[in-house]
């Protein structure tokens, strides 16, 4: 069975060549992640039809957008995409409402799946509709830009580093709106970023690019745990886990989060949440230590029985990265080579992971 989204590109530049062969899910958020110059934006622009690759095949759901072998190239305006750039280019002489309505005009009424009231409510911009763009903050402008893209009733959303031009405060304001779009709209999104914290919070599927090549493509919880990828060697190495809130301790303000497909759970300091709520958390490799026996004489809340899957030298040869299995959930631990030798770590070994900190992402 073919994947809902297929992207095969080859295009040569003086300094590198872009080569992608991707089969992507037709729902959720797929992040294209990598350093500057890795080919993320080029890939997005080719999907949008804004750049032509030397060789290409792009299919979204059941529609072929381009195929160089068959001479197919669908014009950008026919591709049913919503494109969000780093900075929203709004018409300065029009109000927010008029900017949004302008973007809707080319969509026949019978094809409009999203209406202005729904888009403005989803992005929290009802109170901004009468303002002009020069009266908006950077975060407000970008929310208007996202709403404008939604009003084209797209089959695919393309977001090219939409938070890159914003400061930390403005980013934190927009992220919940992107999460809401993810939850409430059945529109796949391709999200370009080089910010690992954004990707960890938003993405379901991760494509890792470097120098125009695809290093990896897969579910984010699996891809972040791969020791053969550069992400595992960085200081922010860690895993993303989507668990379920199973209990709340009102006195200590601790959530109990059950890990997916497992009877194992972790306790997380957080405000009360409804039992059954899905919660995305991140565990950094540097916050995981290993022990042959569970140590209950410490302040560490979370101790999980784990099995060693593999280990690899970290970027600093004094350390190793250890991949662990916690009841089907992957974990990473960054420990010294000395500690590895002292524990006599080996594949299949059973021991205990002690987790010093857990970050709630969403």
Swiss-Prot record:
Domain ABC transporter stretches: 2-236
Gene3D superfamilies the record matches: 2.40.50.100, P-loop containing nucleotide triphosphate hydrolases (3.40.50.300)
Top-level EC class: translocase
SMART domains xref list: AAA
Binding-site positions, ATP: 34-41
PROSITE patterns: ABC_TRANSPORTER_1, ABC_TRANSPORTER_2, MODC, MOP
GO cellular component: plasma membrane
EC identifiers of the protein: 7.3.2.5
Record-linked Pfam families: ABC_tran, TOBE
GO molecular-function term, one example from the UniProt record: ABC-type molybdate transporter activity
Protein location: Cell inner membrane
Catalytic activity: molybdate(out) + ATP + H2O = molybdate(in) + ADP + phosphate + H(+)
SUPFAM superfamilies membership: MOP-like, P-loop containing nucleoside triphosphate hydrolases
UniProt membrane topology term: Peripheral membrane protein
Domain Mop: 297-362
Keywords: ATP-binding, Cell inner membrane, Cell membrane, Membrane, Molybdenum, Nucleotide-binding, Translocase, Transport
Superkingdom of the source species: Bacteria
Xref: InterPro entries: AAA+_ATPase, ABC_transporter-like_ATP-bd, ABC_transporter-like_CS, Mo/tungstate-bd_C_term_dom, ModC_ABC_ATP-bd, Molybdenum_import_ModC, Mop_domain, P-loop_NTPase
Family the entry assigns: Belongs to the ABC transporter superfamily. Molybdate importer (TC 3.A.1.8) family.
NCBIfam families referenced in this protein's UniProt entry, alphabetically: modC_ABC
Biological role: Part of the ABC transporter complex ModABC involved in molybdenum import. Responsible for energy coupling to the transport system.
Subunit structure: The complex is composed of two ATP-binding proteins (ModC), two transmembrane proteins (ModB) and a solute-binding protein (ModA).
Protein name stated in the entry: Molybdenum import ATP-binding protein ModC
Natural source organism: Pseudomonas syringae pv. syringae (strain B728a)
């Amino acid at each position: 069975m073919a994947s809902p989204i297929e992207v095969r590109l080859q295009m040569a530049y003086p300094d590198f060549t872009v080569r992608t062969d991707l089969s992507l899910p037709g729902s959720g958020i797929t992040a294209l992640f990598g350093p500057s110059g890795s080919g993320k934006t080029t890939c997005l622009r080719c999907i949008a039809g804004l750049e032509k690759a030397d060789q290409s095949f792009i299919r979204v759901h059941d529609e072929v957008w381009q195929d160089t072998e068959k001479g197919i190239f669908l014009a950008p305006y026919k591709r049913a995409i919503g494109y969000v750039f780093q900075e929203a280019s709004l018409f300065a002489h029009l109000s927010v409402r008029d900017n949004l309505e302008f973007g809707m005009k080319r969509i026949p009424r019978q094809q409009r799946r999203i209406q202005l009231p729904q888009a403005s409510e989803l992005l929290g911009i009802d109170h901004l509709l009468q303002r002009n763009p020069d009266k908006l903050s950077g975060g407000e402008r970008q929310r208007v830009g996202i709403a404008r893209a939604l009003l084209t009733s797209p089959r695919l959303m393309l977001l090219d580093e939409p938070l890159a031009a914003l400061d930390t405060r403005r980013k934190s304001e927009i992220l919940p709106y992107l999460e809401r779009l993810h939850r409430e709209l059945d529109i796949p999104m391709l999200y370009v970023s080089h910010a690992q914290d954004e990707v960890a919070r938003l993405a379901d599927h991760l494509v890792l690019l470097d120098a125009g090549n695809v290093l990896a493509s897969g579910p984010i919880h699996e891809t972040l745990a791969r020791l053969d990828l550069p992400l595992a060697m960085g200081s922010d190495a860690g895993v993303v886990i989507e668990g379920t809130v199973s209990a709340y301790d009102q006195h200590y303000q601790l959530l109990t989060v059950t890990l997916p497909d497992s009877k194992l759970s972790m306790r997380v300091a957080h405000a009360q949440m409804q039992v059954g709520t899905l919660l995305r958390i991140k565990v950094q490799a540097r916050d995981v230590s290993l022990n042959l026996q569970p140590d209950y004489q410490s302040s560490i809340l979370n101790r999980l029985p784990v099995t060693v899957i593999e280990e690899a030298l970290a970027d600093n040869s004094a350390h190793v990265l250890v991949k662990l299995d916690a009841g089907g959930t992957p974990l990473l631990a960054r420990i010294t080579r000395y500690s590895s030798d002292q524990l006599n770590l080996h594949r299949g070994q059973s021991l205990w992971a002690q987790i010093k900190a857990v970050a709630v992402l969403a």
